C-alpha cells in the first residue's frame, strides 16, 4: 500500500486556546466542513466528537488531545485537540512537541487570557509556527482590533490580519480577504457550507485598504526582492503576498490573523485555507534533534520516507475495546502493522499488533504508516509517553520531554477490600497515561498518595477511577508538596566506625554543603585527591546523601537546590565498605544541614483574578490575607485583573470564597510558578504539626 498523501501535503496542527475560547467548536466545524462528521456536535450539549471522554462531556472542557485526520483541498490535516485548562498544561506541552503548526483560538470578547499566555510560551519554547483565529465574532462586545492589540502588548507577538470582519456581534456576516481584496459572505441557510465572494462594502473600503497596506509592508519585510519591488512602488502579486506570509509565519516573525464565528458557521473555510497555505508541512520544519544512543552524540532526523523508521510516543490512552493505545508521531521512514519496533529510550523491542488511524470517535485499521503521520499503535506494553520508537539498525533517541513535579497531594483510601486491589492497578495505568500524575505511599501512615498539578487535575483522576475502573475511593484533605533548602555554607566531617567483634565498619568523610540557585537541583562534586578515599567508595557517599536528602532535618520534606563537595576523608584497609561510606555521607549531610540555616519552601502559584471593579478592594484584601504578593493590576473589557503570587496552601477552597465574595461574577486561574520561602512563624507551625 503506497502513501496516499504526499508528505508536502500533510499538516500536523494543534488547536490551542484558553478555556471557553471556542476551541472544541472550531475543531468540530473543521471536521464538519472537511466531511467527517454529519451532525455538528455542540459542546453545550456534550456531544462534540473531539471531546470523547465522559468527564469532558459533563464539564464541557477538553482534557485529552484526541488526534483526528481530515482532508481539505487535496491536503491531509492531522488535528490534535489540546486542552485549554491550566491544570492540563502537561497535555498541551506534550502535543506541542509533535505539532508542526498551531491555530491559536482567541475569544473576540475575552481576548488574551492568562492560560493563552502559558500556551503561547509553550509554543515559543518548541518553535511552533502559528496562525491566530479570533472566534465568537457574533458575541456582544466582540472586538477583533482589541484582540490584535492585546496580542502585541501581552504576548509580544507581531499579529498581521489577513482578513478583517464585516460587522460584529449580531451584524457579523463575513470577512474581507485582504490577500484577494474581496468580501466573503456566508449563507445562513446552508449552515455556512456555502459562501459568496463579493466586492468590498463601500463603508469598509478605507479600512480594508489601510490593513492591506500593513499586510503588504509586513510581507515585503520577509524577502529582499519583495522589499525592492515594494519600495519601488510596484504592486506585489497575490502569489508573492502568500509566499511572504508563509515565510514570515514559518520563521515566526509574523502571525497571520483571521476571524470568524465557529458556532455560527462563519470563517471556518477561510481558516482551513490558511492552514494549508501558511502552516508548514513536515518537510518545512527544522530537522528534529536526537541523540545516538551508542555514541551519545547529537544527530538530526529529517522528515522523509527514506531512511529507517523513527517516531515519538506522545500520548497513551486506555481504550475499552482495544486496550492500550500509544499515539505516535512518525518522523522518518515507514512501518507495517505486525512488525517489531525498537524502543531506544528503554532499550527494548516490541511488536506492533495493529495500526489505527483515529477519526475522533471512530477508528480505521491501516496496514502501514509513513513519515509525517500521526497514528495509534496497539500492542505496545512497555512504551511510555516521551519514548522514542525506531529501527534498531539506525537507533536514535529523540529529545526527551520534561515533566513537572506535582505540587499537590491527596490521600486516597479504597472503600472496600476489593477496591484496594483494583485501585493499585488503576492508578498504575493512569500514571502511565499522564506523567505529571504520580502515585506514592506515605511511609509514616502507609496511605496511598496521589500527586498532580492542581485540584482539578486530581479531581478528574478520582473521577476516572470511579468511571473507567469502577473503584470507589474516599479522598483526604489536599496536602501541599513542601520542600526544604539551606541558606548558608557549612563544612562538616563525619567518621562512622563500628568495632564490635568480627568485621568492623569504617567510613570517614569531609564535606562542604552550599546553597544553589532556586530550581537548580542537586549537585555532587568529588574533589578527593591522592586516594584518601578509594574511588570505588565515592558513589556510595553520593548515594548516602541522595537518600538522606529525601527527608530533610526540619520537617522531613525533600531537600532541594544545594551542592555537596566531598574534599577529604580516610579509610581502613579491612573495615571500609560501600555501606560504611554511604552511612558516613548520609550522617555528614544531616549534620551539615542542621548547621546550614535550613528553611522551609512552599509552592507559590501565579494567580490571576478577574472581577468587576466594585469587588476589587475585597478581592485584594482577601489575597493579602492569604499571604499573596500583588504583582500588577490591569483593566480588561471593563473588568479588573489582579495578578499575584499566592502560596498554594492558602488557595484551597478559593473558588467557593471568590464566588460568594463577588456574587459569582469573579473568575480566577492559577498555575504553579516557583518555590518560595515560608515565613518563620508559619514554618514553625508546619514543623510542629509534622512532628506532633
Curated annotation (Swiss-Prot):
Keywords: Cytoplasm, Elongation factor, GTP-binding, Nucleotide-binding, Protein biosynthesis
Cross-referenced InterPro entries: EF-G-like_DII (IPR053905), EFG_II (IPR041095), EFG_III (IPR009022), EFG_III/V (IPR035647), EFG_IV (IPR047872), EFG_V (IPR035649), EFG_V-like (IPR000640), G_TR_CS (IPR031157)
One BP term from GO: ribosome disassembly
GO MF assignments: GTP binding; GTPase activity; translation elongation factor activity
SUPFAM superfamilies, per the entry: EF-G C-terminal domain-like (SSF54980), P-loop containing nucleoside triphosphate hydrolases (SSF52540), Ribosomal protein S5 domain 2-like (SSF54211), Translation proteins (SSF50447)
Location(s), subcellular: Cytoplasm
Gene Ontology cellular component list: cytoplasm
Location of the tr-type G domain: 8-283
Binding site for GTP: 17-24, 81-85, 135-138
Top-level taxon in the UniProt lineage: Bacteria
Lipid metabolism listed as a keyword: no
Family: Belongs to the TRAFAC class translation factor GTPase superfamily. Classic translation factor GTPase family. EF-G/EF-2 subfamily.
Function: Catalyzes the GTP-dependent ribosomal translocation step during translation elongation. During this step, the ribosome changes from the pre-translocational (PRE) to the post-translocational (POST) state as the newly formed A-site-bound peptidyl-tRNA and P-site-bound deacylated tRNA move to the P and E sites, respectively. Catalyzes the coordinated movement of the two tRNA molecules, the mRNA and conformational changes in the ribosome.
HAMAP family attached to this UniProt entry: EF_G_EF_2_B
NCBIfam families: EF-G (TIGR00484), PRK12740.1-3 (NF009379), PRK12740.1-5 (NF009381), small_GTP (TIGR00231)
Name of the protein described by the UniProt record: Elongation factor G
The encoding gene: fusA
Amino acid at each position: 500500500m503506497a502513501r496516499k498523501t504526499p508528505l508536502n501535503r500533510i499538516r500536523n496542527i494543534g488547536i490551542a486556546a484558553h478555556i471557553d475560547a471556542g476551541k472544541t467548536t472550531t475543531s468540530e466545524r473543521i471536521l464538519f466542513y472537511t466531511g467527517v462528521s454529519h451532525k455538528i456536535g455542540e459542546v453545550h450539549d456534550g456531544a462534540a466528537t473531539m471531546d470523547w471522554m465522559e468527564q469532558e462531556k459533563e464539564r464541557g472542557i477538553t482534557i485529552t488531545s484526541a488526534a483526528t485526520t481530515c482532508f481539505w483541498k487535496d491536503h491531509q490535516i492531522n488535528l490534535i485537540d489540546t486542552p485549554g485548562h491550566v491544570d492540563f498544561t502537561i497535555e498541551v506541552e506534550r502535543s506541542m512537541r509533535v505539532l508542526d503548526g498551531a491555530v491559536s483560538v482567541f475569544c473576540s470578547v475575552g481576548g488574551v487570557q492568562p492560560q493563552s499566555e502559558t500556551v503561547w510560551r509553550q509554543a515559543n519554547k518548541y518553535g511552533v509556527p502559528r496562525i491566530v483565529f479570533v472566534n465568537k465574532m457574533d458575541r456582544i462586545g466582540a472586538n477583533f482590533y482589541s484582540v490584535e492589540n492585546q496580542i502585541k502588548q501581552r504576548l509580544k507577538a507581531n499579529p498581521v490580519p489577513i482578513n478583517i470582519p464585516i460587522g460584529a456581534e449580531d451584524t457579523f456576516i463575513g470577512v474581507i480577504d485582504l490577500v484577494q481584496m474581496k468580501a466573503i459572505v456566508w449563507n445562513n441557510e446552508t449552515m455556512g457550507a456555502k459562501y459568496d465572494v463579493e466586492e468590498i462594502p463601500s463603508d469598509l473600503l478605507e479600512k480594508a485598504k489601510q490593513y492591506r497596506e500593513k499586510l503588504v509592508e509586513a510581507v515585503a519585510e520577509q524577502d529582499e526582492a519583495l522589499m525592492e519591488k515594494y519600495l519601488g512602488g510596484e504592486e506585489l502579486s497575490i502569489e508573492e503576498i502568500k509566499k511572504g506570509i508563509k515565510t514570515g509565519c514559518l520563521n515566526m516573525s509574523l502571525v497571520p490573523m483571521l476571524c470568524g464565528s465557529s458556532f455560527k458557521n462563519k470563517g471556518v473555510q477561510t481558516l482551513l485555507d490558511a492552514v494549508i497555505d501558511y502552516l508548514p508541512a513536515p518537510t518545512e520544519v527544522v530537522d528534529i534533534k536526537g541523540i545516538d544512543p551508542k555514541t551519545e552524540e547529537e544527530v538530526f532526523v529529517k522528515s522523509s520516507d527514506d531512511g529507517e523508521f523513527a517516531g515519538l510516543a506522545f500520548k497513551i490512552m486506555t481504550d475499552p475495546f482495544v486496550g492500550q493505545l500509544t499515539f505516535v508521531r512518525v518522523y522518518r521512514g515507514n512501518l507495517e502493522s505486525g512488525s517489531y519496533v525498537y524502543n531506544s529510550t528503554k532499550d527494548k523491542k516490541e511488536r506492533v499488533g495493529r495500526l489505527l488511524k483515529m477519526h475522533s470517535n471512530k477508528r480505521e485499521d491501516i496496514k502501514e504508516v509513513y513519515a509525517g503521520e500521526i497514528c495509534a499503535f496497539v500492542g505496545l506494553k512497555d512504551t511510555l509517553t516521551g519514548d522514542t520508537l525506531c529501527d534498531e539498525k539506525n537507533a536514535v533517541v529523540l529529545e526527551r520531554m520534561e515533566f513537572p513535579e506535582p505540587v499537590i497531594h491527596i490521600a486516597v483510601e479504597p472503600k472496600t477490600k476489593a477496591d484496594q486491589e483494583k485501585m493499585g492497578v488503576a492508578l498504575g495505568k493512569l500514571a502511565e497515561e499522564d506523567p505529571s500524575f504520580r502515585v506514592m505511599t506515605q511511609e509514616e501512615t502507609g496511605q496511598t498518595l496521589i500527586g498532580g498539578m492542581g485540584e482539578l487535575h486530581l479531581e478528574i483522576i478520582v473521577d476516572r477511577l470511579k468511571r473507567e475502573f469502577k473503584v470507589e475511593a474516599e479522598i483526604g484533605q489536599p496536602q501541599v508538596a513542601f520542600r526544604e533548602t539551606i541558606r548558608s555554607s557549612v563544612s562538616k566531617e563525619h567518621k562512622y566506625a563500628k568495632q564490635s567483634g568480627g568485621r568492623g565498619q569504617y567510613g570517614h568523610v569531609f564535606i562542604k554543603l552550599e546553597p544553589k540557585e532556586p530550581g537548580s537541583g542537586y549537585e555532587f562534586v568529588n574533589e578527593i585527591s591522592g586516594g584518601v578515599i578509594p574511588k570505588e567508595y565515592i558513589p556510595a557517599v553520593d548515594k548516602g546523601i541522595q537518600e538522606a536528602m529525601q527527608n530533610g532535618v526540619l520537617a522531613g520534606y525533600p531537600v532541594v537546590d544545594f551542592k555537596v563537595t566531598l574534599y577529604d576523608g580516610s579509610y581502613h584497609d579491612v573495615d571500609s565498605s560501600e555501606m560504611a561510606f554511604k552511612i558516613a555521607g548520609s550522617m555528614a549531610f544531616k549534620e551539615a544541614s542542621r548547621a546550614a540555616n535550613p528553611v522551609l519552601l512552599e509552592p507559590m502559584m501565579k494567580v490571576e483574578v478577574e472581577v468587576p471593579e466594585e469587588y476589587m478592594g475585597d478581592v485584594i484584601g482577601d489575597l493579602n490575607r492569604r499571604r499573596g504578593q500583588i504583582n500588577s493590576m490591569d483593566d480588561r473589557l471593563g473588568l479588573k485583573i489582579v495578578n499575584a503570587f499566592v502560596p498554594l496552601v492558602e488557595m484551597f477552597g478559593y473558588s467557593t470564597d471568590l464566588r460568594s465574595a463577588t456574587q459569582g461574577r469573579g473568575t480566577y486561574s492559577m498555575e504553579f510558578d516557583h518555590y518560595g520561602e515560608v515565613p518563620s512563624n508559619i514554618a514553625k507551625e508546619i514543623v510542629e504539626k509534622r512532628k506532633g
